Structure formats: structure tokens, C-alpha cells
Amino acid sequence: VALNAAQPGFATTVAALRLRSWKLGAGQPMDVIDKFTDADFSHIVDDRADVHVSSRDGRFYLGYFPNGRPGGADEDWVTGEGWVIAVTGTADVPGYRMAFGTDTPAEIVAAVVARILATSQPL
């Protein structure tokens, strides 16, 4: 960033900011859901049209909540949480959980899912 210490305040140029365009908008949830084969995963669509995907061994879970995830301390909607991914750990290594907002681009979530699936191996 171009900075002139002799002048009070902050000054820069558009070129110095290196403005970028970023992927925004929820996108198409099927970009994520299509990553899961019927042979290896169970798919459930509930009465709220939320989608739940789990691995046959039960160690992987993905939830898609287009209107936000239900639940919370007062059973209110957890507003803004649109995607939940969880992998159960083992006796020796803890698992992990991550969540993405309802406006997170599905393309970004799909990339995360693809990477997780690439790391799993049959026993």
C-alpha cells in the first residue's frame, strides 16, 4: 500500500488496493450433494426440506439447512448456519466439525467436501 507519512491521515490508490472479485451467493446446493454416491452414503430430506447425508459407517455427516439450522439453547433456529460437516474421530484421534453460513457459495462447500472425501479410505 502506498503511504505518505508526511501527510496526515491515510491515502492510497485504487491500483495499490489490488481490488478483486470474490465468489459470492449461495449457488446450487446440488454441487455439494451430488458428491455423495448412493453406494457409500445415505441421503435423507426431512419435512423442512433440510438435507442430511451420512456415510454408511456413520462417521461422516453433512447437513444442508437452506433456512438455517434448527436447534440451539431455546430450540430456536441457528440463523445463518446453512451447512454442517462433521467427521467422527477414533479412540485415539478426535474428529472435527465445521459449519458454513447459508450464504456460503455451494461451490466452496463442494471443494471442502471433495477434499474430505479424497482423504477417506476403505478399511
What is the meaning of each model-derived region?
Residues V1-A5, F60-A110:
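Intrinsically disordered, low-complexity regulatory segments enriched in Ser/Thr/Pro
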Residues A2-R59, L123:
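Negatively charged, low-complexity tracts enriched in Asp/Glu with abundant Ser/Thr
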